[in-house]
Amino acid sequence: MILVIDVGNTNCTVGVYEKQKLLKHWRMTTDRHRTSDELGMTVLNFFSYANLTPSDIQGIIISSVVPPIMHAMETMCVRYFNIRPLIVGPGIKTGLNVKVDNPREIGSDRIVNAVAASEEYGTPIIVVDFGTATTFCYIDELGAYQGGAIAPGIMISTEALYNRAAKLPRVDIAESNQIIGKSTVSSMQAGIFYGFVGQCEGIIAEMKKQSNSNPVVVATGGLARMITEKSSAVDILDPFLTLKGLELLYRRNKPTTEK
């Protein structure tokens, strides 16, 4: 079995794979102040609930967009699993031809998603990740990562609206069936929801136009289902795309990461 860990700005997603099959997965809040012991106890609690033990794990791979938490994460892996994890970053074999100005600037989550999407669904393809930021990545018909777009995520935008507009309340993010709200709350929810549906469709349409291609569009991320259910621009919803990519990258780099 291998342990895959995706460290995002808001949440960390943890998964256990055996023979390319996702057996278990969990989510915990990303807290850059957590110690390695706190992280270890949290993961061991997940394992206990699933009747797993640290000795079941032969390898670990981590993707992170939160550098301050990485020392604690790596220490946790060594202390509680006796494994030095593979870190997604410079030097890892991805199989991607990255054609951007500075490849080191690209978030590891975007690379992981691109690897998984290309392998699972073919190319050309657009990957939309609804996370803390909403990211759009384009991989061309030759499998080259050509770049993409980054926009504020739904939660960031919602919090900004509440924090910067004195008379507007904090609202839950929810699907809205009516674009014409009858109250302040319903109007905000309609604006947020349909605004992001429109953003998603607009950026995808412009990417297709500028790339002169007709790529498959796959969406992932915590809020992907809510948005994509209202949008015809997305072809595939894959909530485990990032975990799939981590498992695939582990296999591609396995000889240097085995226990």
UniProtKB/Swiss-Prot annotation:
Residues that coordinate or bind substrate: 107-110, 184
GO BP, sorted A to Z: coenzyme A biosynthetic process
Pathway per the UniProt entry: Cofactor biosynthesis; coenzyme A biosynthesis; CoA from (R)-pantothenate: step 1/5
InterPro entries registered for this protein in UniProt: ATPase_NBD (IPR043129), Type_III_PanK (IPR004619)
SUPFAM superfamilies: Actin-like ATPase domain
Note accompanying the cofactor annotation: A monovalent cation. Ammonium or potassium.
Domain of life: Bacteria
Role: Catalyzes the phosphorylation of pantothenate (Pan), the first step in CoA biosynthesis.
Leading EC class: transferase
This protein's record includes keyword ATP-binding: yes
Ligand binding (ATP): 6-13, 132
UniProt-recorded name of the protein: Type III pantothenate kinase
Subunit and partners: Homodimer.
EC number(s) stated in the UniProt entry for this protein: 2.7.1.33
UniProt-annotated catalytic positions: 109 (proton acceptor)
Essential cofactor(s): NH4(+); K(+)
Listed PANTHER family: TYPE III PANTOTHENATE KINASE (PTHR34265:SF1)
A matching Pfam family: Pan_kinase
Keyword field: ATP-binding, Coenzyme A biosynthesis, Cytoplasm, Kinase, Metal-binding, Nucleotide-binding, Potassium, Transferase
GO MF, any single term: ATP binding
